[in-house]
C-alpha cells in the first residue's frame, strides 16, 4: 500500500513521515516474503506482493550507474541511503565504497530470491531475467570492489568482506584467500570482536552458518569488552540496544539476528527450501570448544 507509482518504497510502513534507512529497509519485502515461505510454507505474501517486488527492483535499476546501484535521492517519504547501520565506533558506516558494496550485494541477493519466488509461483518466463541480472551484478561487484593485491573488498570491514562471499560474487578460486583476509582483519584490526551493525550481523551469521565457521562467531561472542553482547549484559542490558555503546535506544532490534545462529549453527536446525515449513529439515550441529 505504501509503494509509489515509480516503484519506490518507504523505509517503514505505515509511512506517516520521512523515515531513515536504505535498500535493506525498503527492499525487505523480498526476503521477508521468501523466508516466510521457507519457514512456514505460506505462499500468500509471495503471491500478493510479487508485482510489488518486481516494481521495486525496476525502481532500484533506475538508479544503477555502470551496472551498479548508486544513491537515490531523499524524498518526502524516505530519507537517507544507508548500507550498514550503527557498527561499532571506529568503523565508518558512511564510507561510500562500503555503502555501495553492501547495497549492491543486497540487490544481487534480491534478484536471486525473486528468481526462486518466480519458480515457486510458476512464473517460469521471469526466472532467466532475474538470474541473468544477478550474475551480471555479482561479476560487477567483484570487478569494482576487490583489491587483488590485498585480497580485500571495499573498506575491508567484516560486512564488506563477508557479503560478497555470501552472495557468490567472490570467485571460488579466491574464496580461501578472502576468508583468510577476513580472519586477519577480525583478529588484528577488530581485536577479535564483532564489528558490524544491524545489517551486518545477519550477513555474518548467515555466512558463518553456511560455511561451518561456528568457532569464528563463538570467539567473538565470548568477548566481554566493547563491542559485544556480553558487554551489553555486563552493563545492565536486559534487551538488545540500538548501538553497541548503549547511547541510543535501550530496546531495539538492531542486533537480534544473532539469535538465528544459535538455532541454525549451534543446534544445527536449518530448513530445506525444497520442502518448506519444515516438512523436511536438516540437523547438523556445529559444536564449538569451551
Regions picked out by a protein language model, each given a short descriptive name:
Residues 1-11, 39-103, 120-163, 223, ...:
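Active-site acid/base region of carbohydrate-active enzymes
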Residues 14-26, 86-106, 143-161, 167-169, ...:
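Solvent-exposed loop and edge beta-strand segments that line ligand/cofactor-binding
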Residues 22-29, 46, 53, 100, ...:
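Active-site-proximal structural scaffolding
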Residues 28-31, 35, 48, 52-55, ...:
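Extracytoplasmic/secreted proteins, especially bacterial periplasmic and envelope-associated proteins
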Residues 29-45, 106-124, 162-173, 203-211, ...:
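Well-ordered alpha-helical scaffold segments within catalytic/enzyme domains
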Residues 132, 215-290:
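Non-catalytic C-terminal accessory modules of carbohydrate-active enzymes
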Residues 174-183:
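Alpha-helical repeat scaffolds
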Amino acid at each position: 500500500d505504501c509503494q509509489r507509482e515509480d516503484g519506490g518504497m518507504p523505509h517503514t510502513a505505515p509511512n506517516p513521515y520521512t523515515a531513515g534507512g536504505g535498500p535493506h529497509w525498503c527492499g525487505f519485502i523480498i526476503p521477508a516474503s521468501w523466508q516466510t515461505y521457507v519457514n512456514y510454507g505460506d505462499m500468500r505474501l509471495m503471491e500478493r506482493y510479487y508485482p510489488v517486488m518486481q516494481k521495486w527492483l525496476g525502481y532500484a535499476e533506475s538508479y544503477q550507474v555502470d551496472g551498479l546501484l548508486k544513491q537515490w535521492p531523499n524524498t518526502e517519504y524516505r530519507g537517507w541511503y544507508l548500507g550498514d547501520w550503527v557498527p561499532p565506533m571506529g568503523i565508518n558506516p558512511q564510507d561510500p565504497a562500503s555503502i555501495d558494496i553492501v547495497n549492491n550485494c543486497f540487490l544481487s541477493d534480491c534478484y536471486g530470491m525473486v528468481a526462486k519466488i518466480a519458480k515457486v509461483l510458476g512464473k517460469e518466463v521471469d526466472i532467466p531475467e532475474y538470474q541473468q541480472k544477478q550474475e551480471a551484478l555479482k561479476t560487477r561487484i567483484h570487478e569494482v570492489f576487490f583489491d587483488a593485491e590485498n585480497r580485500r573488498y571495499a573498506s575491508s570491514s567484516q560486512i564488506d568482506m563477508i557479503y560478497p562471499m555470501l552472495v557468490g560474487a567472490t570467485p571460488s578460486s579466491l574464496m580461501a584467500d578472502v576468508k583468510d583476509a577476513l580472519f586477519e582483519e577480525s583478529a588484528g584490526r577488530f581485536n577479535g570482536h564483532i564489528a558490524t551493525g544491524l545489517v551486518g550481523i545477519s550477513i555474518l551469521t548467515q555466512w558463518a552458518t553456511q560455511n561451518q565457521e561456528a568457532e569464528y562467531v563463538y570467539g567473538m561472542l565470548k568477548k566481554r569488552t566493547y563491542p559485544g553482547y556480553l558487554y551489553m549484559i555486563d552493563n545492565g542490558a536486559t534487551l538488545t540496544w540500538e548501538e553497541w555503546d548503549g547511547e541510543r535506544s535501550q530496546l531495539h532490534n538492531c542486533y537480534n539476528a544473532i539469535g538465528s545462529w544459535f538455532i541454525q549453527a549451534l543446534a544445527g536446525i536449518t530448513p530445506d527450501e525444497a520442502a518448506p515449513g519444515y516438512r523436511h529439515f536438516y540437523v547438523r550441529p556445529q559444536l564449538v570448544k569451551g
